[in-house]
Amino acid sequence: MQNIKCVVVGDGAVGKTCMLISYTTNGFPSEYIPTVFDNYCANLMLEGKPYSLGLWDTAGQEDYDRLRPLSYPHTDVFLICFSIISQASFENVTTKWFKEVNHHAPGVPIILVGTKQDIRNDNDSIKKLKEKNIELVPYEKGLEKAKEINAIYLEASALTQRGIKDVFDQCIRSVIYPNKLIKKPKKKSCTIM
């Protein structure tokens, strides 16, 4: 059985822990408990082969900026998460999380995950958010951000579990097929004659 280490990063309260609990227990936590550091494990089959997916949940709060990178060595894949209802968490993908991950573990595959995807189809929630002048991060913006950081973009909902399995299957695929999923930009060359 191949072991794969997946570290999950992103701002506090974007839904990282809920996503991990939803995936590993098929349940949704009833209350918010900030994470300092937690581990989960999922054994699964993909394409007829067994994998042990070690899921490392990290704290997004600034207080843990010096502690969090201690979980980065030997990481096979990172999930950088943001909430589709938080522009600030979306902006921090590049201004904080990608910089941090790329500094400590350059070249490790990244999957960008937009959490709380269920809200896209919930007109009541969208209306309440608009009343508070909160706009959803458009799906296309997620795709653009993923391209910018050379990542794959997926959206998921811990509440409905929509897209959750895809996220973690993609974690494994990005490790076992690293060159098939992320197209690196071709280097431009100049020939002088």
Swiss-Prot record:
Keywords: GTP-binding, Lipoprotein, Membrane, Methylation, Nucleotide-binding, Prenylation. Its main location: membrane. A lipid is attached at residue 190 (S-geranylgeranyl cysteine). InterPro entries: P-loop_NTPase, Small_GTP-bd, Small_GTPase, Small_GTPase_Rho. CDD domains: Rho. GTP binds at residues 10-17, 57-61, 115-118. It is a lipid-anchor. Residues 191-193 form a propeptide. The keyword Membrane applies. Gene3D superfamilies: P-loop containing nucleotide triphosphate hydrolases (3.40.50.300). GO terms for molecular function: GTP binding; GTPase activity; protein kinase binding. The modification Cysteine methyl ester is found at residue 190. It comes from the Eukaryota. A motif (Effector region) lies at residues 32-40. GO terms for cellular component: cell cortex; cell projection; cytoplasm; cytoplasmic vesicle; cytoskeleton; macropinosome; phagocytic cup; plasma membrane. The keyword tRNA-binding does not apply. GO terms for biological process: actin filament organization; cortical cytoskeleton organization; establishment or maintenance of cell polarity; mitotic cytokinesis; regulation of actin cytoskeleton organization; regulation of cell shape; response to imidacloprid; sexual reproduction. It is found in: Membrane. Belongs to the small GTPase superfamily. Rho family. Might act in concert and/or share functions with other members of the RHO family in the regulation of a subset of cytoskeletal rearrangements that are required for these processes. Interacts with pakB. This is Rho-related protein racF1. The lineage of its organism: Eukaryota, Amoebozoa, Evosea, Eumycetozoa, Dictyostelia.
